[in-house]
């Protein structure tokens, strides 16, 4: 059993180790938020199971995914669980390895390039900057209840870079809460859609303008929201 991060965006951002495991798998259990070219790495005889995991589209419940992993592993097959980005950055990889541990199924983990760092970077936005931003905070843009995280006030108080994942739909609420809790309306913000892909789009503004800018540009998910403490 291999828990593999596919990286963010184009297929060639996967690690060499991750690609090699896919080439030798019997079963490939994959998220929809990956480059479909990666499916071609698997043997023709491999069973390929899509479990979704994309906002606004049908996805298997996490419990069902866990059951699939255990079932296929107990059949004696080499299983690759291919997850978008990095398995442990809002990827629920921790829940999956807990299930595997409980079932006494050995596993290996292959990290992936996370969109939280790579997408801003590819847009020319460093998440840390000497003497200007000494920390970076990676925050979910929505919870299971489709609400903002409870620590949004602390996010507003930090001088570090804020990176929100899966938060495009909640952008107005994120902006409102940051301003209400003390973040300057002039704080630079960027929203990067489909980062690390050929069709990527970057929209820039400030907390006071970004919502209107994003609406005018018709930005679509997946998107990463970055608020920086420098210009």
Question: What is each stretch, according to the model?
Answer:
Residues 1-11, 16-110, 118, 211:
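Class I S-adenosyl-L-methionine
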Residues 36-37, 55-57, 114-118, 136-137, ...:
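Short gly/pro/ser/thr-enriched loop/turn and capping motifs at secondary-structure boundaries
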Residues 10, 86-158, 201-204:
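Class I SAM-dependent methyltransferase SAM-binding "motif I" and its flanking Rossmann-like core
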Residues 17-21, 43-46, 96-99, 124-125, ...:
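Short, solvent-exposed amphipathic alpha-helical segments in soluble enzyme
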Residues 1-3, 75-79, 135, 144-229:
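A contiguous loop/helix-start segment that scaffolds small-molecule binding in enzyme catalytic cores
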Residues 46-53, 106-108, 127-134, 182-191:
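Short hydrophobic/aromatic-enriched beta-strand-loop microsegments
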Residues 33, 141, 194:
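Cofactor-binding loop segments of dinucleotide-utilizing enzymes, especially the Rossmann-like FAD-
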